[in-house]
A protein has these predicted regions:
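Phenylalanine-focused residue identity feature
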Residues: 16, 40, 51, 58, ...
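Non-catalytic connector elements of ABC transporters
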Residues: 68, 77-193
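C-terminal boundary and immediately downstream tail of ABC-type ATPase nucleotide-binding domains
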Residues: 53-78
Length: 193
């Protein structure tokens, strides 16, 4: 259905306002999308802008399939560098994120850290988790993991090789400081923006 609507829009060359509760439709059909909650606009942007730079926890949680993972974390600043700590794992944020947080003079605080499932990597030493479910998707495996008291989804590429993660197996996970989103615990606002 989406392909037909896109073709129709291109053929008649006019502006469409399409209202949907299906975020996948919004992402695939819209040149620009408006995300609303309780009658209030949360964010306006291109699908890619909204996906890459969610304004708040609500937007981060509804845009993207599977949805973004959220961790309880600690944002720290030492020697002008911001780090986030989840459990026993500390990651330094990217230079771009450092600049944006510093520009807003963000203080050390407990935060909610958001990381998309395809931005989490398995490693030898990281945030520890237990596999609850392993879903083979062909080119990837979707792991449903319990880590730090949270349900986490990790997308692991199979690279053509069979990937087997039995229920109950232990995994360690890490994420890059360039892909983590830092949200205020009180307001839910993305602290970079």
């Amino acid at each position: 259905m989406s392909a037909e609507i896109i073709k129709l829009r291109e053929r008649i060359d006019t502006t469409f306002i399409y209202v949907t509760h299906d975020q996948t439709e919004a992402m695939t059909l819209g040149d620009r999308i408006v995300i609303m909650k309780d009658g209030f606009i949360q964010q306006i942007g291109t699908p890619q802008e909204v996906f890459d730079h969610p304004a708040n926890l609500f937007v981060a949680g509804v845009i993207g399939v599977p949805q973004m993972n959220f961790f309880d974390a600690r944002l720290s600043r030492r020697d002008g560098k911001y780090t986030v700590t989840v459990g026993s794992v500390t990651v330094e944020l990217s230079p771009e994120k450092q600049q944006r947080l510093a520009a807003h003079n963000v203080a050390e605080q407990d935060v909610t850290l958001g990381v998309r499932p395809d931005h989490i990597m398995l490693c030898a030493d990281g945030v520890k988790g237990t596999v609850d479910v392993s879903e083979m998707m062909g080119s990837s495996v979707h792991l449903h993991v319990t880590a730090e008291g949270k349900d986490v989804i990790v997308i692991v590429p199979t690279n053509g090789a069979a990937a087997h993660f039995p229920m109950g197996s232990e995994v360690n996970m890490i994420f890059g400081g360039n892909v983590a989103h830092v949200f205020d615990n009180t307001t839910g606002k993305n602290l970079e923006w």
